[in-house]
């Protein structure tokens, strides 16, 4: 990717160039947080067809559907260390900019609810490795969603209502995912305090919480 006119070459350092891997046999730890996203992945047409992938229309962040849905049908993957895709980051107009996350929060909510319900429906049909992989991807996405409301949305009354409603929704639809993200200190803290600090001033209170955690240990 390129940021401030400086380029960084992204590689999956623990994967061998041109080697074919069986997804169910690999130890996911070798990926070290370097997962397969739209900018670094391509699928055979047949896999896209059999997966039934149909992206939400007129919606931001649907790349997350591409990151998850075809993965349920793929059995093997081959890594090619090629410089094909150039991604420019840090631009204000990007949908990944946090201000735009806040502005487009309804898009993000629509997308992540779709993913949660999709995964809940098909998870029992997946291998344990695929379930773990997809849950890792969903955990990253859920972290972003909670951050939008707990830290960045300056409309605190709206943020409070949205995150309380979403948290209850997640508990109802997929308790395992709900419990999985409880490992994140700021989510656990906000749940314990019933998100009241989001209503007051989310970012300041969550920053204070993170500082307190460093000094005094886990909440």
Provide a role label for each language-model segment:
Residues 82-91, 97-126, 144-174:
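Catalytic core of nucleotide-sugar-dependent glycosyltransferases
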Residues 150-219:
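Membrane-interface aromatic/basic loop that binds lipid-linked glycans or pyrophosphate carriers
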Residues 38-39, 53, 71-74, 79-80, ...:
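Gram-positive cell-envelope targeting signals
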Residues 125-131, 178-182:
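Short, surface-exposed acidic
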Residues 27-28, 116, 135, 164-167, ...:
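Generic detector of well-ordered alpha-helical segments enriched in charged/polar residues
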Residues 1-80, 87-103:
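Donor-binding/catalytic cores of nucleotide-activated saccharide
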Residues 132-148:
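Amphipathic alpha-helical repeat scaffolds of TPR domains
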């Amino acid at each position: 990717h390129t940021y401030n006119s400086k380029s960084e070459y992204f590689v999956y350092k623990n994967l061998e160039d041109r080697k074919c891997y069986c997804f169910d046999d690999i130890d996911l730890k070798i990926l070290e947080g370097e997962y397969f996203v739209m900018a670094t992945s391509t699928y055979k047409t047949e896999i896209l067809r059999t997966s039934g992938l149909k992206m939400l229309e007129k919606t931001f962040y649907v790349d997350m559907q591409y990151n998850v849905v075809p993965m349920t049908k793929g059995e093997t993957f081959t890594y090619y260390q090629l410089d094909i895709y150039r991604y420019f980051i840090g631009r204000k107009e990007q949908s990944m900019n946090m201000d735009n996350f806040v502005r487009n929060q309804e898009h993000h909510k629509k997308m992540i609810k779709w993913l949660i319900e999709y995964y809940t429906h098909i998870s029992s049909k997946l291998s344990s490795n695929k379930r773990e992989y997809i849950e890792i991807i969903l955990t990253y996405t859920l972290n972003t969603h909670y951050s939008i409301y707990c830290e960045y949305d300056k409309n605190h009354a709206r943020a409070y209502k949205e995150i309380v409603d979403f948290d209850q929704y997640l508990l109802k639809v997929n308790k395992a995912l709900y419990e999985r993200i409880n490992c994140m200190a700021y989510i656990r803290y906000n749940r314990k305090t019933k998100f009241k600090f989001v209503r007051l001033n989310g970012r300041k209170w969550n920053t204070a919480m993170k500082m307190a955690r460093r000094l005094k240990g886990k909440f």
